[in-house]
Amino acid sequence: METLFNGTLSLAGRDQETTGFAWWAGNARLINLSGKLLGAHVAHAGLIVFWAGAMNLFEVAHFVPEKPMYEQGLILLPHLATLGWGVGPGGEVIDTFPYFVSGVLHLISSAVLGFGGIYHALLGPETLEESFPFFGYVWKDRNKMTTILGIHLILLGLGAFLLVFKALYFGGVYDTWAPGGGDVRKITNLTLSPSVIFGYLLKSPFGGEGWIVSVDDLEDIIGGHVWLGSICILGGIWHILTKPFAWARRAFVWSGEAYLSYSLAALAVFGFIACCFVWFNNTAYPSEFYGPTGPEASQAQAFTFLVRDQRLGANVGSAQGPTGLGKYLMRSPTGEVIFGGETMRFWDLRAPWLEPLRGPNGLDLSRLKKDIQPWQERRSAEYMTHAPLGSLNSVGGVATEINAVNYVSPRSWLATSHFVLGFFLFVGHLWHAGRARAAAAGFEKGIDRDLEPVLSMTPLN
């Protein structure tokens, strides 16, 4: 096998001499080869979908219906369960066949994508402009670029509407707030009021406000997808039909690397938002499948011991804790009755097992004395020992809890992975944006290939 370091190996217009990029620069060699770049992207999509299908089947094969999903390290089945497949009241899995079907469909799709990727990478035309002008492009062609942007927006809008149709017409989705501890239901009266939907965007991100992450009913979530899907589709049509205005032509850099940097920035934002969503939100990410949120596990612990000590005769309304504040109950800064002790910092928490015990002024003492249901006790005791605090050696739960289980919560995995990947994507955005701006300004030199040490070394073989 010849190496590229001695420059004799020609790769049909993809070698170092013709592109300025060595083999390890990956798709940079394909910047001007639209056909080969298509192959790389389709093959990449095939790898992604193959992972989804294979991992899906792996989780199905290892799934134990008697244990909660979050105790089994699952990250794909909780998403399918949230969409209402295979689950019944209380989030209990009653049928794993839909999960199997999902895995098989993804595997079949990945085979089609894989074949297309290999075809376009090896056999198809190097460039699409001559044979298929509709699919061809020049990076500098602003009109074509916004047309491609428009097509992408329409596809994203259709994706948002897929969730809407699932919730409205195809069996519904899982609602953790359904009475008695959660159930699958069809969403009937959507929230379409713009003041409600866009009100989320205007909220503070802090404390009890929580920006869009604070959404806690499915009507708002599905209604938001109606709005978002409509905006994406209308924006897509707009971008297909129009050319960029003068201010936009001046404001942006119009090159392949610039578009890459914009995409990386968008993905970084998505990653950071997803991190906060999966960490704090127990409506879009029901605790029955993903495990409790951190605040939820803490409040569940306070609730569990309130129940226990009340049974043992404690007067939970007036008992004092070691600091002189209420041991079980106290008041928040705004006057609501909240759980006392260290969990006071999580007094904003809203959870379906706790809300029935609230009155107009926070936790209702008479309900705490008379109305606590067994399912609420069971659920809080379970959540108390499954806090999303797993460490590297997988000792999950609160460290001092003797009943803690060996597990890392899927919330920990999903929040951490999306934060880390979002950060890497942001750094990639800065890198490629800097290079694209420098190239546009005309002073991007790159590495001086003539002085690169590796060129003077002997070939590997």
From Swiss-Prot:
Membrane topology, record value: Multi-pass membrane protein
Subcellular location: Plastid, Chloroplast thylakoid membrane
UniProt keywords, alphabetically: Acetylation, Chlorophyll, Chloroplast, Chromophore, Manganese, Membrane, Metal-binding, Phosphoprotein, Photosynthesis, Photosystem II, Plastid, Thylakoid, Transmembrane, Transmembrane helix
GO cellular component: chloroplast thylakoid membrane; photosystem II
Residues involved in [CaMn4O5] cluster binding: 355
Predominant cellular place of this UniProt entry's protein: plastid
Residues with the Phosphothreonine modification: 3
GO molecular function, one term: electron transporter, transferring electrons within the cyclic electron transport pathway of photosynthesis activity
InterPro entries in UniProt: PS_antenna-like, PS_II_antenna-like_sf, PSII_PsbC, PSII_PsbC_sf
Cofactor annotation comment: Binds multiple chlorophylls and provides some of the ligands for the Ca-4Mn-5O cluster of the oxygen-evolving complex. It may also provide a ligand for a Cl- that is required for oxygen evolution. PSII binds additional chlorophylls, carotenoids and specific lipids.
Keyword Acetylation: yes
Residues recorded with modification N-acetylthreonine: 3
A biological process term (GO) from this entry: photosynthetic electron transport in photosystem II
Propeptide residue range(s): 1-2
Keyword Hydrolase applies: no
Subunit structure and binding partners: PSII is composed of 1 copy each of membrane proteins PsbA, PsbB, PsbC, PsbD, PsbE, PsbF, PsbH, PsbI, PsbJ, PsbK, PsbL, PsbM, PsbT, PsbX, PsbY, PsbZ, Psb30/Ycf12, at least 3 peripheral proteins of the oxygen-evolving complex and a large number of cofactors. It forms dimeric complexes.
Main function: One of the components of the core complex of photosystem II (PSII). It binds chlorophyll and helps catalyze the primary light-induced photochemical processes of PSII. PSII is a light-driven water:plastoquinone oxidoreductase, using light energy to abstract electrons from H(2)O, generating O(2) and a proton gradient subsequently used for ATP formation.
Family: Belongs to the PsbB/PsbC family. PsbC subfamily.
Protein name per the record: Photosystem II CP43 reaction center protein
Organism: Ceratophyllum demersum
